Amino acid sequence: MGDGWRPGVADLVKNTPKVLNLKDSMKVLFLASWYPMNGRSGNGIFAIRQAEALAQAYQRFGRSVTVDVMAVQPRAWMGGRVQILGEVPGGPDQSTPRGDLRHWLLTYQDGRGGLFSLINQCWAWLRLLRAYHRHHGDRATVVVAQVAWKAAVVALLLGRPYGVMEHWSGYLEKEPPLKPITKWLVRRSLRNARSVAAVSPWLADALMQFCSGLRVSTLPNVIEEVHWTPPAVDLAAGQGAAGDVTSGSEPWRDPRVFLHVSDLAPVKNPALLFGAWALSGLSDQGYLLRVAGEYSQESKARYASVKGLEWLGILSPTELCYQLRSSRALLLSSHRETFSILAGEALLNGCSVWTSYPPLRSFYQGLDGLVSLPDDQPLTWSLALQEAAASNPHPWNSPQAVRLVQERLKPYRNHEAGQAMLSWIDAWKP
């Protein structure tokens, strides 16, 4: 295994705090295929939010249950070596109660070939599981695998009762991009699960097509509480200043500002986004496209020649809320979305959402603020941008309209989503 930085298993177990009074309580272990590299933001935050919501639900009912989240991630993804052993992390942005969720995370050396990578990952999982056992005095009662590959495969090997919670958009492709052996492992882990759920009806349908005979229910994602305070009625131009989250005041919604938030991966369709923006010519009229998210410097450089862009980088939940309340519309250019927490966050903050993805158009149908585009062609989007610039529509986000959004999205609030997760686990736990 060769990495000199790694402490031995004995040292790891010795240095992990042991809690002697937890052995008789129910223990729920979330295995996360992805773990956010930036705290409260980034790919994988959905797993943390669901685990927190579940932990808080157990607390509300006074049930003696511990909830932990565990992940093994490549160092390249996490930006270096990371070791979290049974910590309850806090942070400057306390917009969501944590529910005393305990985290376990190790990174492994990737990029050394398939066999070396597999050995490194197995070793990291073994270390974490032994440390978890030392802390709790026993194995997990039930396991929740967040995304089948690779968490459900690990859950299958553990031999504990487990359910699978799926978020991956790969199943929405005509042929999921998985190698044959990976497909076999994923299908076996799904079929051996006590229950399988997905975050949207269209993802559930795709999973059942991928794995014949599988029954898949739907469980909601979690939209953080910071987004549930209704925005103030839009101010007239000049009465505020967008982009200054430090002031604490309600931002002015700038009709000349559009927003996009993603890592600019191919599934997010950046070619459509930037192609339509450049074709529209709005930058020459003083319009601005703000781009936020976990994009790489290579992605940023690729579109450096496009005029009228402002790069924001990674945003905290509070910063995202501010930007959504500062922008005219969120441009959601994705080829596919399993649910899009971001679309819900935008509408809750009174920000219009533009999308051409049919399931999202259907899901949000009837809500003011949804701009449904007929296709994902740059010309279609550029013409829509030009038309928006030429018009001066009355703000859609009246208190009544935002209340309708809140009613539609109520199952995705922390309290309700946590209760749904608790009921799901109660239905299949031993």
Question: Model-predicted segments: where are they?
Answer:
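Conserved acidic donor-binding segment of nucleotide-sugar-dependent glycosyltransferases
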Residues: 367-379, 383-393
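An aromatic- and histidine-rich active-site surface loop
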Residues: 117-128, 142-160
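Short hydrophobic beta-strand element within catalytic cores of glycosyltransferases
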Residues: 352-356
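Membrane-proximal helix-turn-helix segments that form the acceptor-binding/catalytic region
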Residues: 179-196
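Nucleotide-activated donor-binding/catalytic signature segment of Leloir-type glycosyltransferases, i.e.
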Residues: 299-318
